[in-house]
Structures are given as C-alpha cells and as structure tokens.
A protein has these predicted regions:
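Glycine/proline-enriched, intrinsically flexible loops and inter-domain linkers
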Residues: 2-100, 105-128, 132-283, 287-497
Length: 497
C-alpha cells in the first residue's frame, strides 16, 4: 500500500498572464525582504545557541487558504516543512474559528505533519479589516524537548515517546493573550525550561513583526493589488518550473543509495527512488526503500516532501521562488511502513541523516537528465554530533566533525561541509566555551583519513575538525546519530573528470 501525495494545483487551469512582470518581480522581492527581516529577528533575539549561532530555523508567509507565499529558508530541509504544519493547523482549526491575536503551535510528525520533535512550529494569523488574509510562520530547532537523552536526538531510540514532548496542533495564544499554563506545561517537559520559554516567546514575537510588515504592505499597495500579486507570483513559479520540466527527457530513472544501518546496527538500509518525468509532472516513487527502521532514522512523510522540493529546486532552478507554485507539478509516493514513510509510533529524531541520503538519491536519479555542469558527485551525507550536558555551566555544548560535499565539474571536493539538506551553521568555538564550558584545543579545516583521493585544498573550512575537552562539564555525554554512508571502507577511489 502506498501513500500518494499531490499538492492540489490552485492555478492549473490557466496559463499565467502577467500584466506587469516587472512589478511582480518587485513584489516577490518585497515578500522575501519581509521573510529575511523575520529570519534576522528570530536569529538575533533567540537565546539558545542552536538558533542564534547555528541558525537552525526558517520563516514563511502563507495566504488564508494555506498556500505558501514566500519562505526564507536557512535550512533546505525546511522547504515544505512549514507547509505541513500549516495544513495541520487548518485541518484542526477551520478558518471561521481563527481569531485575530491567536497563535498556534505544533511539532508532532504524526499528529501535525511535523519533521521531528525538536522542530517547533509557531503560526500566527494576519487579519485585515477583520478578515483573515495571511499567516506568518516560523520553525526553529530547540536544543532540547525532553525525552530519553539530552538534545532529544539519538539514533538508537526506538519510539517517538522516547524523543520528547509531542505537541499536536493547538492554540498557545487567544485574542492576544498567551496561554501561560500551556506554555509552562510544554517547557516543564524539557531540560532547560527557562530557555524554552524565552525561545518560544521570540518565535511568537517574530511572527508579530512579520504580520505587521504584511499589513504595512497591504496598507501601501491595497488589498486587491496584494492578493492579485500573490496569485501572479505563485502562477509564475509554477509555469517556470513546468518550463524546466518540459526540457527534460520523458521516462523513468531509478537510483539507489544505502544507509549503513537503521540506527540499531545490522545490514545497510536501501534508499531507492524512481523519478518519472512527463510533460507537466515529476513523480517520485520510493518503492524499494528499506523497511521502517528500528531506531530513529525514519523519515516522516512530510520531511520526505521537503527533501523532494529542495532537490528539484536545487537541480532545475535554484533561483525559483519558494512558494506553492513549486509544489504543484510534483507528486510523490512511498510505501507505508518503510524508512521513507514510517508508521506511528516509529522514532524519527535522527531523520536528518536519512533526509540527506534521500536528497542524494534524488540527485542521482537526475544524473542522466542534466548536463555535466549541473550534476554532483555523491556527498558525505552524514550528521554526527556529540552532546554534553550538565548542571553547570549550561550543558549541551554540541559540536560536529563534518565530512565532504561531492565534487562538481570544475569545482574541487569541499571538506568540512554538510552534503545536502542540513545546512545549519557550526557553533563558534567562543560560543561553545562561553555557554557550555567546552574546552576546544584545536579547530581547523583539515580532516584526517578522508575517504577517496580528494584533498581539502583551498576549500578547507575552519570547522572541519575540532578537538574538545569535555572534562569541565558534568553529567551526561551523549553520542549523537552517526550515519557515515560508507563505513570505514571509504567511498571508492574516485576518478578525474
């Protein structure tokens, strides 16, 4: 049995006719400037290093029907993640029940189309003249949401109940008044309630700033002009993607990649995708992927969507505006009970590793369709982390040793970089020492025992390798999810092109 997904086309029955293409481009950039301002607010005002230093967050604007209008994407995997939360809110709260001043919250992958529990979504309706017109939204990865281990992520967890507090789609503010009881309840189930309260308040304030900017845009342009321009932007994005699809050769293309294991050891787990190209559609079928993982490597279906959207945008048209028009020509399906579409209550916390492998498989499926300069070799597709926690100083000083991003034609292999999907910044050495008491004895861009014949060269990054002395910390030391795609055998000898 498969679980198909097709985002309904809101503009499929007409080719967009743009009376003012220059004005539409200006309007599109106005929207993106609002999301950029929201993102800067969220990063600069937050308290946890995961948001303010690593910038593991994204923001978006939706219209009253729940269509994505614009998104400021720090993390590629978030492209589409907020879309699932928006759908969950509208399923739970019909438009006639939404009031000015309400704020909504959710994080659950099964109850609210979330990505994994640390990613908490905050969504705020935007009213004009007493009528719901838009939503401002953001998603942020919180340092801890409870569960069995500090940081709430470990590849060996077996159930989502071990991973932290589950938040279905619910109202955290009514008519401008925050539900302090609900806020305390959520934060009391984490290891740092004070930090969670502060970050959630920052997320709500970020949406208020975005809502005010949207209302200012309506005040300046007029409501009808704004609504018409939104339709134009979405229709143009859809048409532009359809033009890119029309340039591809019709047919089906399959690629397979493998995870080392399912988070609990054992045999490699296949990640397989079959891309079917037609005149006006790209369909991604994940039949042939491995069964549902025993550990936390499972990828929720909404996160699978985000991987597909990111890969299509990156490969076919990186400058494509991130809005609902991007989703319309894309469909996907995955068998229920597999690692790419798990059943409740499978653990999903370490889904970033699987997401990177999925994106890599999609890149591979496109390899025969694109010119050499647009293709990319396999990447490290790994997201290792070590989490320290203790009573003093404020525990959880995460750091990572990043691997390689695949070589491209005319560009050298790049070490110390995430391959795809998870593009969070590394925590600065100074921040790690100040906030977590982590003593870093070395930080440079050289990575020893690098797989293959590549060399870091001028593309080395300072965060490629860090040696830390955790002895100043106290309490837990948790080895986070490790998903090296090639174990110790390396990725092969490679060859020059």
């Amino acid at each position: 049995m498969t679980k198909p997904d097709s985002v309904q086309s809101r503009a499929a029955d007409a080719t967009p006719t743009l009376a003012d293409p220059i004005g539409m481009e200006v309007f599109c950039n106005r929207l993106l400037s609002i999301t950029e301002d929201m993102n800067n607010t969220l990063v600069r005002a937050s308290f946890s290093t995961n948001i303010k230093e690593r910038k593991d967050c994204s923001v978006a604007l939706f219209d009253a029907a729940g269509r994505l209008v614009a998104q400021g994407t720090q993390i590629p995997l978030h492209l589409g993640s907020l879309d699932g939360a928006m759908r969950a809110i509208l399923r739970t709260f019909p438009a006639d029940q939404i009031r000015d001043g309400d704020v909504y919250i959710c994080n659950d992958p099964y109850l609210a189309d979330g990505s994994h529990l640390p990613d908490i979504n905050i969504i705020t309706p935007v009213f004009w003249d007493g009528v719901l017109r838009f939503f401002a939204a953001n998603i942020a990865h919180h340092s801890d949401v409870g569960g069995a281990v500090p940081g709430s992520i470990a590849g060996g967890l077996k159930s989502i109940f071990e991973e932290g507090i589950r938040i279905p789609a619910c109202r955290i503010a009514r008519a401008g008044e925050t539900d302090e009881d609900l806020l305390r309840l959520i934060c009391a189930n984490t290891r740092d309630p004070e930090e969670r309260v502060l970050d959630l308040r920052v997320q709500m304030a970020t949406n208020r700033r975005g809502a005010a900017a949207v209302q200012g845009l309506i005040r300046q342009m007029g409501l009808e002009a704004v609504l018409r321009s939104v339709d134009d932007v979405i229709a143009y994005t859809r048409k532009r993607l359809l033009n890119r699809i029309a340039e591809l050769r019709a047919g089906s293309y399959t690629f397979r990649s493998d995870l080392d294991d399912d988070g609990m050891g054992g045999d490699p787990v296949p990640i397989q995708v079959t891309l079917t190209v037609s005149a006006d559609n790209l369909h991604f079928d994940f039949e042939g992927s491995g069964k549902q993982a025993r550990g936390a490597m499972n990828l929720p279906f909404n996160a699978l969507r985000a991987c597909v959207y990111y890969a299509v945008k990156a490969l076919l048209d990186p400058d494509l505006a991130p809005n609902a028009g991007l989703f319309d020509p894309i469909t996907l399906s995955a068998p229920v009970g597999t690692i790419t579409n798990p059943e409740h209550p499978a653990a999903v916390g370490a889904r970033s590793i699987t997401a990177q492998k999925v994106a890599g498989a999609i890149f591979g499926a496109f390899r025969g369709l694109l010119p050499p300069e647009k293709t990319m070799a396999s990447s490290n597709d790994c997201c290792p982390a070590i989490v320290f926690s203790g009573r003093w100083p404020r525990g959880r000083g995460p750091f990572r040793v990043s691997g390689n991003a695949g070589r491209r034609r005319g560009r050298a292999l790049r070490c110390g970089r995430h391959g795809r999907g998870a593009r969070a910044h590394d925590q600065h050495v100074e921040s790690a020492r100040g906030s977590a008491g982590e003593r870093v004895s070395a930080a440079d861009g050289r990575v020893r025992d690098d797989p293959g014949l590549g060399r870091c060269g001028p593309h080395a990054r300072r965060h490629g390798h860090r040696q830390a002395d955790p002895r100043r910390g106290t309490g837990h030391r948790v080895l986070g999810p490790l998903g090296q795609p090639h174990r110790r055998r390396g990725g092969g000898r490679g060859r020059r092109t």
